[in-house]
């Protein structure tokens, strides 16, 4: 199932309970599509959300609203039913907003092209925390709710851990020779996986963020521009060669290809029932892949190790991380395009705005 959006999309997200998918485009438009198992995508709504590119998009408020982040430095909340503007943080950052994720029911986190991360308190309608650990654009963020820590990756080649309880940057990795482009937490919180520009996956153990404990090189030399966690042992990668793959972590191996685009992958997202994988790329196409059909039988093999992992980590207590070097795709993509991707929110962020 696929549709030509008419322009490149840099962020996508699925509705948390119904068959709707949203896409944020390079021209600032927000598109909303309905899908089902048997027919093509049908556009339900088109909204001019931003003056510049829409870099990130997520459903919040149980799917009642869509939040978008833009190169115009703003964050916008749009009503799903009417398409009306609900709230607008016009100058959320001093630079282009590149990433946005949900943190708690009353806070979200946003990251910009200069490396600044902000935590927004929706009740106070203000920025409650600000972290400036990075020297280049924020490429990805993920939140560890049990410890109230935000894990951040950047084009400067480092990963940081921001403690929301102490309002301090608790840890930061050594500088890598390569940009860190994407991040997920796996193995029940014991491992942090980062995608890099040269295609190496870096595995950090929780609590030991200075250096990586493992590296997986089978995707090289294609930069890993998008990472999506499928479960605690498997993730989905989107690379700049247009290939989408299912990858096992510890043991590290490429399990199987999922699909492809003609151009670099920009963003990946899972439907509410995990039946469909959504993907966007630099070919203006939005594609939905039926994971139930594609992955049938792959669970049986999820314990086999093939593939090349430079270090073999037993995944005991989990505590390392590492970066590899040598390419140029996500960082340059995010900043050059003046539109990037990734937004993650599941609560009532703009409820009080």
Swiss-Prot record:
Quaternary structure, from the entry: Interacts with DDB1A.
Coiled-coil region list: none
Name of the gene encoding the protein in the UniProt record: WDR55
Pfam families from the UniProt entry: WDR55 (PF24796)
CC annotations in GO: cytoplasm; nucleus
Residues in WD repeats: 4-43, 49-88, 92-130, 133-172, 175-214, 218-257, 260-299
Family: Belongs to the WD repeat WDR55 family.
Single GO biological process annotation from the record: determination of bilateral symmetry
Miscellaneous section: Plants with a weak allele homozygous for WDR55 display pleiotropic phenotypes in the seedling and adult stages.
Bias (Low complexity) ranges: 339-353
Compartment annotation: Nucleus; Cytoplasm
Tissues expressing the protein: Highly expressed in roots. Expressed in cotyledons, leaves, buds and flowers.
Region of interest (Disordered), residue spans: 300-353
Primary location: nucleus
Protein name (database record): WD repeat-containing protein 55
Disruption-associated phenotype: Embryonic lethality when homozygous, due to embryo and endosperm developmental arrest at various stages ranging from the zygote stage to the globular stage. Failure in the fusion of the polar cells in embryo sac development.
Record Gene3D superfamilies: YVTN repeat-like/Quinoprotein amine dehydrogenase
UniProt entry keywords in alphabetical sequence: Cytoplasm, Developmental protein, Nucleus, Repeat, WD repeat
Organism: Arabidopsis thaliana
Job description of the protein: Required for male and female gametogenesis, seed development, and embryo and endosperm development at early stages. Involved in the establishment of bilateral symmetry in the transition from the globular to the heart embryo stage. May act in the frame of a CRL4 complex. Required for proper vegetative growth and organization of the adult plant body. May play a role in hormonal control of plant development.
InterPro entries in the cross-refs: WD40/YVTN_repeat-like_dom_sf, WD40_repeat_CS, WD40_repeat_dom_sf, WD40_rpt, WDR55, WDR55_POC1
Biased composition (Acidic residues): 310-323
């Amino acid at each position: 199932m696929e549709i030509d959006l008419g322009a490149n999309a840099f962020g996508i997200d699925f509705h948390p309970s119904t068959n709707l998918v949203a896409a944020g485009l390079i021209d600032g438009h927000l598109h909303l599509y309905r899908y089902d198992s048997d027919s093509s995508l049908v556009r339900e709504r088109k909204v001019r959300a931003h003056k510049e590119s829409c870099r990130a998009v997520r459903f919040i408020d149980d799917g009642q609203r869509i939040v978008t982040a833009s190169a115009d430095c703003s964050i916008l909340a749009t009503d799903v039913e009417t398409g009306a503007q609900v709230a607008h943080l016009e100058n959320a950052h001093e630079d282009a907003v590149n990433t946005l994720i949900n943190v708690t029911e009353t806070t979200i986190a946003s990251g910009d092209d200069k490396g600044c991360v902000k935590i927004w308190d929706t009740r106070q309608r203000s920025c409650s925390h600000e972290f400036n650990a990075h020297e280049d654009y924020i490429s990805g963020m993920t939140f560890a709710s049990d410890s109230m820590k935000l894990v951040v990756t950047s084009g400067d080649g480092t990963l940081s851990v921001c403690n929301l309880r102490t309002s301090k940057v608790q840890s930061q990795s050594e500088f890598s020779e390569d940009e860190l482009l994407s991040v997920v937490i796996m193995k029940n919180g014991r491992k942090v996986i980062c995608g890099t520009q040269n295609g190496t996956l870096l595995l950090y153990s929780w609590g030991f963020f200075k250096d990586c404990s493992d590296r997986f090189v089978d995707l090289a030399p294609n930069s890993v521009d998008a990472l999506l966690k499928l479960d605690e042992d498997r993730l989905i990668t989107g690379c700049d060669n247009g290939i989408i793959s299912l990858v096992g972590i510890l043991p590290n191996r490429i399990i199987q290809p999922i699909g492809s685009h003609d151009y670099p992958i920009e963003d990946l997202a899972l439907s509410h029932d995990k039946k469909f994988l959504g993907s966007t790329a630099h070919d203006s196409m939005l594609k939905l892949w039926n994971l139930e059909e594609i992955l049938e039988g792959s669970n049986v093999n999820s314990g086999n190790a093939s593939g090349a992992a430079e270090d073999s980590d037993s995944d005991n207590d989990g505590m390392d991380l590492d970066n590899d070097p040598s390419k140029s795709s996500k960082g340059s993509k995010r900043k050059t395009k003046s539109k990037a991707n990734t937004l993650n929110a599941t609560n009532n962020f703009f409820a009080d705005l």
